[in-house]
């Protein structure tokens, strides 16, 4: 199970967002020029040898065990080589930045992903992990939101009714093949 986590006390201000929209959720469309940006600060003030990789996950954020070359085009592991040293501050820190996709690593497949940053090219020395989504418009969804129809939820919850139109996608067993996740996203751009 992978979550959003920081494993070192000196790592602060971790942000993962769509490029150009700092307050956005980390979601981009497969095959477009959209990018995600990960930023974090290392308050130790020392320049560290960080690397990163991507893990493709299932709907429950467990590793999908698909071979990395099936979902990554390019190098499987890369150094974090975009950084800036602090200046004119009361204490020293280093700000690190990763943009995805990039020239070294591109996505081949949509899905749930975890970006894992680790030290000294040692995947046992994990520094942080952040979840994000890559999606593709494979289906069309038609939906409505209304007040809950079950008495226990009236006044506090909503009901979402929807239909999935999938003319170019074969779904033989919807209970096994389809998982619906409803997220309330902000419209901040």
Q: Which residues are covered by each model-predicted region?
A:
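Contiguous beta-strand segments within globular domains
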Residues: 6-56, 152-168
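Beta-strand-rich binding/interaction modules
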Residues: 52, 111, 172-183
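Short acidic/polar inter-strand loop motif in beta-rich domains
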Residues: 59-61, 105, 119-126
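Extended, solvent-exposed segments with strong compositional bias
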Residues: 72-93
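Ligand-binding face of N-terminal immunoglobulin V-set domains in extracellular IgSF glycoproteins
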Residues: 92-105, 110-120
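C-terminal edge beta-strand
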Residues: 129-133
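Low-complexity, Pro/Ser/Thr- and charge-rich linker/hinge segments at domain boundaries
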Residues: 134-157
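Conserved small/polar residues in nucleotide/adenosyl-binding loops
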Residues: 189
